[in-house]
Regions:
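N-terminal, post-signal peptide beta-strand-biased segments of exported outer-membrane/organellar beta-barrel
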Residues: 1-71, 385-388
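Outer-membrane beta-barrel porins/channels
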Residues: 48-489
Length: 489
């Protein structure tokens, strides 16, 4: 039968970070204790909605078409504190600010597809999606790349970019090798997000006056959307042009799955066909009506190793220096503001099944999965949960038939589910370990000099602090509630 489905996941993703101050970190941050430990901070636990709508239309016994609007199953918006209280109740700049303070956006993939039974019991499908994305991220950087600086030296940066064409292609097949066993395979390729936009800056945002009294009179705002980059200085006129100065590129991994499904019919296929024949109708398999239960095992792969970095670029000179000024201070926006990730491919195992308690009326289901870690400890971050994960889910479907004619397929289906994911901790607590440095507004730390477009004489990358800001322990937990409604006809 044909059907239209509307559903939404409600995602609660909780992330916490217990930062450790690097041994060579010379910044003056009163939040760190004598052992370099910062207070544990967590994101706000806010529900993120992930709605989906789709439909399939049966053209004939062999051909069907479908359309779908779906977003990635991710944690969505994240809000971290700009300021936290120390042991005396005094508000200070938050310890995770160099990694993330805000994350929000919209990524949607309208998709159309077609499926055809090319041979008896062999079905193939192909789909094409046209995605678009609007992304907002905020974090802190340091202005002067030097020692002995306080949070007064920090700049709050708010990046906003968009990409209105992200092509996606997927293909799959399903072979019913016996009346009780199906095997299937699926592959998906998605182009990288290649977004354009601008960045807004706020200097002196993390001062004690703003933290403790909300006094933002010293905050200097700028934005690369303006011709003078928002500095208000005549000498900067034209440096930011007409905007669109930020270029962001993020690879989206290829994915593939193979699976096998066993289903136990209530009656044999021959008997089901015999029962359908007197009514003059052909037999069409309906798992909720015809099966007692099913169980499925899937193996999954995601090419996350394609994500070496979140690539963030701004206009620069031929020598690698940033060309865009920051309002209120003597520094510039780095031409190369990439955020390293160096992910690994992810492999997973998923198992689940349905048990039809009431034929053609009520099904209960359960499943579980495990996936390997994508992230490496050296590059750990609080934006995406990239550690090993184990999860389970429970749910069910209740069908309400419309009309009393058994030959008709019209029905309403109500679906609900709950899932929980356990994440392994990401931990790197050696204060002498390497990690991800913060961005800086001047090229090299201390007395180091520029030796190349992206290097300083001390061997470090330009426009980066001399110390990492991601050391510590990151924990994650996720709960997902799913509700849906379908009409089949």
């Amino acid at each position: 039968p044909s059907r239209v489905t509307l559903q939404s996941s409600i995602i609660f993703h909780h992330t916490c970070f217990s930062r450790i101050k690097a041994a060579n970190d010379t910044s003056l941050d009163p939040l760190a204790d004598g052992a370099g430990r910062f207070p544990r901070v967590c994101n706000d636990i806010e529900p993120a909605l992930n709605p989906q709508i789709g439909g399939t239309l049966r053209i004939n016994d062999r051909l069907g078409i479908g359309a779908l609007i779906i977003g990635p199953s991710a944690s969505g918006e994240k809000n971290w504190p700009d300021f936290v209280e120390d042991g005396n109740g005094t508000r200070r700049a938050s310890p995770q600010r160099y990694l993330l303070t805000r994350q929000s956006g919209l990524i949607v993939f309208p998709t159309i597809g077609v499926g055809y039974e090319v041979l008896s019991n062999l079905r193939l499908g192909l789909s094409f999606g046209w995605g678009f994305a609007k992304i907002k991220n905020a974090a802190a950087t340091v202005a002067l790349n030097s020692s002995g600086q306080t949070s007064d030296n920090d700049v709050r940066a708010n990046l906003q970019v968009r990409d209105y064409f992200i092509p996606r292609v997927s293909a799959g097949g399903l072979w019913s090798i016996t009346p009780n066993v199906d095997v299937a395979g699926w592959y998906q390729w998605t182009d990288a997000v290649k977004a354009r936009g601008d960045v807004g800056t706020a200097t002196s945002f993390y001062t004690a006056a703003n933290a403790q009294r909300g006094d933002d009179s010293r905050v200097g705002y700028g934005d690369t959307i303006f011709s003078d980059c928002g500095t208000g200085r005549p000498q900067d006129e034209g440096k930011c042009g007409s905007g669109d100065n930020a270029k962001v590129k993020l690879a989206l991994p290829m994915e593939a799955k193979i699976g096998i499904r066993y289903h136990r019919p209530r009656v044999s296929l021959e008997e089901a066909q015999r029962q359908a024949a007197p009514g003059g109708k052909s037999f069409r398999r309906d798992p909720l009506a015809n099966d007692l239960f099913d169980i499925e095992l899937d193996l999954t792969w995601a090419n996350n190793s394609a994500i070496d970095a979140l690539e963030i670029r701004f206009p620069g000179t031929s020598t690698g220096a940033g060309r865009l000024p920051v309002s209120g201070i003597n520094s510039e926006i780095p031409a190369r503001a990439d955020q390293p990730r160096h992910y690994r491919d992810v492999f997973g195992i998923r198992v689940g099944g349905d048990y039809n308690v009431l034929p053609d009326q009520l099904a209960l289901r359960a499943g579980a999965y495990i996936e390997t870690a994508a992230g490496r400890e050296q590059f750990q971050h609080i934006d995406f949960a990239a550690s090993q994960r184990i999860g389970f889910a429970l749910g069910g479907t209740y069908r309400i038939r419309l009309g009393k004619d058994p030959a008709r397929t019209d029905a309403i289906e109500i679906m609900a589910g709950y899932g929980h994911t356990f994440f392994a901790d990401q931990s790197r607590t050696d204060r002498n370990a390497s990690g991800v440095p913060a961005l800086a507004g001047t090229s090299c730390y201390g007395d180091a000099t520029v030796t190349g477009p992206n290097r300083c004489s001390d061997g470090r990358e330009r426009y980066r602090t001399a110390w990492p800001v991601n050391l510590g322990t990151i924990t994650n937990a996720m709960n997902v509630i799913n509700v849906g409604l379908a009409y089949r006809f």
